[in-house]
Amino acid sequence: MPQPMIARRTLLAAAGLLAARGAFAQTADGRVQVRIATDHGDILAALEVAKAPVTCANFLRYVDSGRYDGSSFYRATRAPGAPTVGLIEGGIDDPRKLYPPIAHESTLMTGLKHRDGTLSMAREGLGTATSDFFICSGETSYLDANPSAPGDNAGYAAFGQVVQGMDVVRAILALPTTGVARDPAMQGQILDPPARIVSMRREG
């Protein structure tokens, strides 16, 4: 876990980065909108910059630098017997394009929840998230932090919500998952072919 002083400096740096970008792309409620253009259609997401400042600043850093352009949604997980429930995961495959990992902002810290259309950061251990993120389809509250659960119970860092384009999310979720997995635990979850992310841009 990050030390309090490190976390405080990270929060200050994130707030400064967001302020430097200006408020032109913010909605009336202070959220920042990002359009994710894919080869299956567009997804419009609203980022909760006030509630998840570290996570949103990291995501917007990749957006503003163009590093998500040409990346892909490469993974789809579907609940057994409920093919429209699950998530699609995307990110950057080239390690040279990755920024340093960020501190984990749990749902207990942000007050955000994993529900239909939630954007959240993929991770391994705490403080390992870089570019990979996922979009939820259907009820996914099991991804929230749960202090009473055994083991790693910090959940995932929710940071935004799809406001348009859930039909695109579900179309990608339904694509064939016959690709070869690097991790055996992901076998049967790798999109073949992946859904290309053409570009990501702030909207407004």
What do these predicted regions represent?
Residues 2-6, 12-204:
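Cyclophilin-like peptidyl-prolyl cis-trans isomerases
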